[in-house]
C-alpha cells in the first residue's frame, strides 16, 4: 500500500517479549502484522473506520511497531527494535479499529540527547507511519492522545520533540497539534572518523518541533 508518513520520528518492562513472540512478529505478512488477531482472521477485519474518532490508541510491542513502520513509512522505513529498547525511555503505540492497525508511532529518548539541554527528560517521536486507508486527521488525533498518556504516566518527561524532513513535509501535523518549531538543523551524517554508521536514509535539512509537557520533572 502507499502510505502517509512523517519523519518522526519509555522504558516499559512489561512490554518485553520472548524469543518466540519476536520470531512470530518477524514472520507475519504485511497484512497480518496489522491485525491484533492474525491467527483468527489472517488480517481480515470488519468495516473500515470513517472517522479518526473511531480509532483507539493503544500501546504495542516495539517489534510490531517497527514492522509496521517498515511496511508503511515511505521515507524512513528502517528502524530496528534493538535501537529503540536500548534507550533510557521508550514506548510504542498503535491506532486501531476492530483490532486492525491504521497507524504506528515509536518514541524513545532523543537520538541527540547529549546535545540537548533537556536530553535526559525529553522524549522523541522517532517514527510515525500511517496507512493510506486511515481516516482523515488520524495523525493529529493520535499525537494528541499519546501526549496525554505520556504526560500522565511518565512524570519525569518534560519535553516532547520530533524532526520534520523538509524535503517532503511542511510540518502541518505538528502545527495542528500545537507544537512549535524550535530550530532548523542542516542534514549531516552520523558517520565520523571514529565511528562508522549505517548509510543514512535521508540527509535533508530537519526542523525540530517541540511540545512542552511541564517545566520540571515530577519526582
Residue spans for each PLM region:
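A positional "C-terminalness" feature that preferentially activates on distal terminal regions of long
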Residues: 27-35
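Conserved beta-hairpin
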Residues: 89-105
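Flexible, glycine-/basic-rich loop-and-beta segments that form/coincide
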Residues: 216-219
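Short hydrophobic/aromatic beta-strand or adjacent loop that forms the aromatic wall/cage
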Residues: 90, 204-208
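Cysteine-rich micro-motifs
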Residues: 3-13
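Short amphipathic alpha-helix that is part of the acyltransferase structural core
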Residues: 35-83
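Acyl-donor binding region in acyl/amide transferases
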Residues: 56-59, 104, 108-205
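Short, charge-rich patches within N-terminal targeting peptides
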Residues: 16-19
Amino acid at each position: 500500500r502507499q502510505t502517509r508518513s512523517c519523519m518522526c520520528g519509555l522504558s516499559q518492562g512489561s512490554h518485553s517479549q520472548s524469543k518466540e513472540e519476536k520470531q512470530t512478529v518477524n514472520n507475519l505478512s504485511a497484512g497480518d502484522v496489522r491485525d491484533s488477531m492474525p491467527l483468527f482472521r489472517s488480517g481480515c477485519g470488519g468495516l473500515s473506520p470513517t472517522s479518526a474518532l473511531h480509532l483507539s490508541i493503544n500501546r504495542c510491542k516495539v517489534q510490531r511497531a517497527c514492522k509496521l513502520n517498515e511496511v508503511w513509512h515511505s521515507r524512513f522505513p528502517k528502524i530496528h527494535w534493538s535501537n529503540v529498547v536500548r534507550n533510557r525511555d521508550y514506548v510504542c503505540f498503535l491506532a486501531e479499529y476492530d483490532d486492525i492497525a491504521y497507524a504506528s508511532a515509536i518514541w524513545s529518548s532523543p537520538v541527540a540527547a547529549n546535545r540537548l539541554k533537556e536530553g535526559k527528560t525529553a522524549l522523541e517521536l522517532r517514527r510515525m507511519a500511517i496507512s493510506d486507508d486511515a481516516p482523515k486527521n488520524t495523525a493529529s488525533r493520535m499525537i494528541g492522545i499519546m501526549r496525554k498518556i505520556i504526560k500522565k504516566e511518565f512524570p519525569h518527561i518534560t519535553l516532547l520533540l520530533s524532526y520534520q524532513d523538509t524535503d517532503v513535509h511542511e510540518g502541518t501535523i505538528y502545527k495542528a497539534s500545537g507544537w512549535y518549531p524550535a530550530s532548523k538543523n542542516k542534514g549531516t551524517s552520523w558517520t565520523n572518523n571514529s565511528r562508522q554508521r549505517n548509510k543514512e536514509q535521508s540527509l535533508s535539512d530537519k526542523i525540530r518541533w517541540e511540545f512542552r509537557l511541564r517545566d520540571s520533572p515530577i519526582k
